């Protein structure tokens, strides 16, 4: 932050976490504050709602656009929005020349093991040899699909371990 820039002290309150305090510039976006909150709470930015009084702050707007531009302390309230758990259509893309596609109906609450079992049903490839990625991340056993930020229409990519060399 430039030495002459006015500095804000932002306090974020929540029922679930201790008071969080951040220094900010009036021209910082609300999203930047949400990223600070994520670093302390692990709550994804898209699942956060920040309130100034009863007004919901929009991620792309700057703090100054809400009249927050002087050297002062502001108090924000954090609410966590739980994503719904409806079935989401995802497409599984097999590796190889054919790149076959399969439709999978997956819930955010589905475990990676459950998804790998669905993949076995569609492809015949056993879970032990499956390498599945979504949004650039390898799906790990013991995790839930919600951990990967899945959305309707995401692609899952399937590759396999080569057994025996």
From Swiss-Prot:
Query: Domain Ubiquitin-like, which positions?
Result: 6-81, 90-163
Broad class of where this protein is predominantly found: nucleus
Specify whether Phosphoprotein is a keyword of the entry. Answer: no
- Tell me which SMART domains the record gives: UBQ
CDD domains, alphabetized: Ubl1_FAT10 (cd17052), Ubl2_FAT10 (cd17053)
Report the GO terms under cellular component. Answer: aggresome; cytoplasm; cytosol; fibrillar center; nucleoplasm; nucleus
Question: SUPFAM superfamilies, from UniProt?
Answer: Ubiquitin-like
Q: Where is this site: Activation by thioester intermediate formation with UBA6?
A: 164-165
Instruction: Identify the InterPro entries for this entry.
Output: Ubiquitin-like_dom (IPR000626), Ubiquitin-like_domsf (IPR029071), Ubiquitin_D (IPR042969), Ubiquitin_dom (IPR019956)
State the compartments where it is located: Nucleus; Cytoplasm
Question: What modifications does the entry list under PTM / processing?
Answer: Can be acetylated.
User: What is the role of this chain?
Assistant: Ubiquitin-like protein modifier which can be covalently attached to target proteins and subsequently leads to their degradation by the 26S proteasome, in a NUB1-dependent manner. Conjugation to the target protein is activated by UBA6 via adenylation of its C-terminal glycine. Promotes the expression of the proteasome subunit beta type-9 (PSMB9/LMP2). Regulates TNF-alpha-induced and LPS-mediated activation of the central mediator of innate immunity NF-kappa-B by promoting TNF-alpha-mediated proteasomal degradation of ubiquitinated-I-kappa-B-alpha.
Quaternary state and partners of this protein? Interacts directly with the 26S proteasome. Interacts with NUB1; this interaction facilitates the linking of UBD-conjugated target protein to the proteasome complex and accelerates its own degradation and that of its conjugates. Interacts (via ubiquitin-like 1 domain) with the spindle checkpoint protein MAD2L1 during mitosis. Present in aggresomes of proteasome inhibited cells. Interacts with HDAC6 under proteasome impairment conditions. Forms a thioester with UBA6 in cells stimulated with tumor necrosis factor-alpha (TNFa) and interferon-gamma (IFNg). Interacts with SQSTM1 and TP53/p53.
Q: What is this protein called?
A: Ubiquitin D
Q: Organism source for this protein?
A: Homo sapiens (Human)
Gene responsible for this protein: UBD
